[in-house]
Each structure stands twice: as C-alpha cells, then as structure tokens.
C-alpha cells in the first residue's frame, strides 16, 4: 500500500467542520487553479482561432504562393507573364502543390449617377477555387467566370456596394484607362461578398479572366500570374524554395522573367502582427501559472500549519520527513486535479458556447471579424493540463520542506 497516498486520500476526503481555516484555503487554491486553466484555455483557443481566421482571409485573396513577373512582385504595377498550359502543368507537378489558378489584375473606376470609386478588378477563370468567395457571399451568386469570353458580370464587396449604393442585379459602368484612351464597360452585379478585411474589401472586384486580359491589351496566354495553394501551410517556404530553383529567373517567350513570393512576403505587416500574438499568449500563460502556483503555495502552507499536530503524531509513529512531504504533495495533487476539472469545464464550455452561438461580438472595422473566432485544439488543451499539474507540483516542493522543521514533541501538544 502507498502509505502517503492513503493518508492524503483520507485527509482530503474527510469533512471536518473544525478545520475552519484550511477548508476555505483549499477552496481558494482549487479556484485559483480552475480560473487560471480556464483563462489559459480561452486565450489559446481564441488566439489560434483569430490567427487562422485572419490568415485564411488573406490567403483567400492571394493563395499561399504567387508566381508572376519579377516586376509585378516588386512594384504596384501589373506586368504580363506567359501562363500557358506548359507552365501551369510545370507548377502543378511541383512537390507539395495542391492547386494552381491563373489571375489577372487591372485598375478601373466604378461610376454611378451620384458617385465613383477606384477599384481593382481581379480576373479569374474556370479553374479558380471559389470556396473562399462562397464562404463570404452575403447576396447574389458567383457567376461562371471564363478565360474564353466575357460575361460582363462582377462580384463586389459590401463596402463598395454601400459606398456606391449598389445592389445585386443592378448594372454599373466601369471606366478603364488604356494607352491614353478611356474604355467604358457596363457590368451586371452578380453578387456581393463581405470578408471584413478592409484593405481588400475597399477595392477588390472579381470578373472574368478574359475581360481583365483584354482590358490590359495582353495576349491570350498572358496573365498577371498564377496563385498556388500548397498542401501544408507550415511548409510553404519549403515549397517556394522549389519554385526558386525551378521557375524563378526563367524567361517566357515574350522576354519576361518569372519570379515567386509567398503570401507572408506579400503581406509582411499582417503576418508579423499575427506572430506577435504568440508573445501575448506566453505572457498570459505565465501570469496564470503564477496565479495558480501562488494560491497553491499559500493553500499548502495553511494546511501544513493546521495539520501540525497530525505531522507530529506521524513522526512519533516513525514516519520520516520524506513520507510526510509526499503525503501533502499527494494532497496538493488532489486539489490541483479538482481545479483542473473545474477549469476544463469552464474554459471548454465558454469556447464551445462561442463557437456554436457567436455570443461575443467584435467590431469588424478594427478586428477584421464580427465575432470572436475560436478554434479547439484538444492536444494543446491536454498539454496545458499536464503542464499546469507539473509546474504547480514543482513549485510546491520547496514549501513542503517546512515539514522537516516541525518537532514531534512540540507539535503533538500544538492545538
């Protein structure tokens, strides 16, 4: 029989009304662990959800990697690059690549009777993965975009629609400047999307690849570039290095040079900001572990002092300091365990409530999302539980040495 464990279970399970000091101390220590763990779970799940939601929105507008003309990736101007079947097949055969799609960008002005707005038209074709657009559609539908003909239909954001007072099904004129000539086009608004990523929502419209290429006066096999989706975002740099060796610095038949950049290189400020959130998480984890540790230390010291008489009796019966220390560490383990159970119920419960109801709202103009995004990561939650238990027990080792300073004769007479 494990003697320290047996004694600890008897002490912990005993309902002793005389222990007016230790009972509240146990409850406070348990609550400290529970609240600390709950805050850690909520913080980690919210930060993970926020990072992945914002990342997915940025990736939705530009995929993981872009292969384009060298000058296009270095400046704000659009330079054409050949994107024929041979190059597309070459990109698709690259290890780690999941999907390849062409795109062409052009600038224009949307004009109504009362207002006008400069926007960026993104031309896309049949192979374009519209999953991201579907997820963010709020009105209308996505037309069948083509690289063979113009459907004269566009998708606009809610931001643009509100500013120009446009609705689905209405027609709007767009004006494009080409070779010092103004080229008007009339489009039908097929649908309206909203991502809350303001830097894109303010300017981005979707139309046919054919339309964008023609408006830029490019050849049929030219485009702004290709967007590549990789199988594993964590290995995007590794996949891009293959393009650097395989595609970059090669020249197409028009004399243009291929180059590539990852979405992190194209949007460094956003991804640096997201990386900084990890620092906030570590600060929160450290603070909550400290709170749990302090409450456990104070709780254990109170229990040891109140059980001085019992410690003296155990020593008189032959129990050594190590055995008694182990007894109180087991007692602390029970307190921590109960705190972990309550903390998991509270933390996971709040996260589940937010995930399925979206009860906690945010200002999308500031945070890019309308509700607090959360993401369950059960392996990480398990690691938080284990780490909390281990760290709390480690910090309790030093206070437990107080037992070695308790003298049996004096402590037996202590009441």
Give, region by region, the residue ranges found by the protein language model.
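Short cytosolic juxtamembrane segments of multi-pass membrane proteins
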Residues: 401-415
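Membrane-interface junction motifs in transport/secretion proteins
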Residues: 51-85
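A structural signal for hydrophobic secondary-structure junctions
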Residues: 81-221
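Transmembrane alpha-helical interface segments in multi-pass membrane proteins
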Residues: 301-303, 310-354
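Short helix-loop junctions at transmembrane helix boundaries
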Residues: 338-384, 397-401, 405
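Hydrophobic alpha-helical transmembrane segments of multi-pass inner-membrane transport and secretion
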Residues: 21-48, 275-310, 333-342, 390-394
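A short beta-strand structural signal in non-transmembrane regions
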Residues: 65, 160, 221-244, 259
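Peri-transmembrane interface segments
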Residues: 16-27, 239-242, 246-291, 303-305
């Amino acid at each position: 029989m494990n003697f320290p464990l047996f004694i600890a279970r008897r002490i912990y399970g005993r309902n002793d009304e005389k222990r007016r000091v230790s009972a509240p101390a146990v409850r406070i220590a348990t609550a400290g662990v529970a609240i600390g763990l709950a805050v850690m779970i909520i913080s980690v799940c919210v930060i993970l959800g926020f990072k992945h939601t914002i990342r997915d929105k940025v990736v939705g507008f530009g995929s993981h990697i872009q292969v384009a003309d060298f000058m296009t990736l270095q400046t704000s101007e659009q330079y054409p690059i050949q994107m024929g079947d041979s190059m597309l097949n070459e990109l698709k055969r690259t290890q780690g690549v999941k999907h390849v799609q062409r795109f062409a960008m052009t600038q224009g002005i949307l004009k109504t009777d009362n207002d006008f707005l400069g926007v960026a038209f993104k031309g896309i074709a049949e192979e374009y993965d519209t999953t991201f657009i579907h997820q963010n559609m709020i009105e209308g539908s996505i037309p069948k975009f083509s690289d063979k003909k113009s459907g004269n239909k566009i998708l606009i954001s809610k931001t643009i629609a509100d500013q120009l007072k446009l609705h689905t099904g209405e027609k709007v004129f767009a004006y494009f400047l080409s070779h010092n000539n103004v080229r008007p086009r009339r489009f039908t608004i097929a649908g309206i999307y909203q991502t809350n990523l303001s830097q894109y929502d303010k300017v981005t419209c979707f139309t046919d690849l054919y339309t964008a290429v023609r408006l830029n006066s490019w050849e049929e096999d030219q485009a702004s570039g290709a967007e590549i989706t990789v199988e594993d975002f964590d290995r995007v740099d590794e996949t891009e290095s293959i393009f650097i060796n395989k595609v970059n610095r090669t020249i197409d038949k028009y004399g243009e040079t291929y180059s590539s950049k990852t979405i992190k290189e194209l949007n460094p400020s956003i991804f640096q900001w997201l990386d900084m959130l990890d620092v906030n998480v570590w600060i929160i984890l450290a603070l909550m572990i400290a709170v749990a540790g302090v409450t456990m230390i104070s709780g254990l010291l109170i229990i040891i002092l109140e059980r001085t008489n019992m410690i003296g009796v155990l020593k008189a019966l032959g129990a050594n300091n190590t055995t008694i220390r182990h007894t109180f560490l087991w007692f602390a383990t029970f307190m921590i365990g109960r705190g972990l159970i309550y903390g998991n119920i509270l933390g996971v419960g709040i996260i589940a409530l937010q995930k399925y109801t979206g009860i906690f709202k945010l200002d999308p103009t500031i945070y890019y999302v309308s509700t607090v995004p959360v993401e369950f990561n059960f392996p990480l939650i398990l690691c938080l539980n284990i780490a909390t238990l281990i760290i709390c027990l480690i910090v309790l080792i030093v206070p437990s040495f107080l037992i070695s300073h308790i003298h049996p004769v004096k402590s037996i007479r202590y009441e």
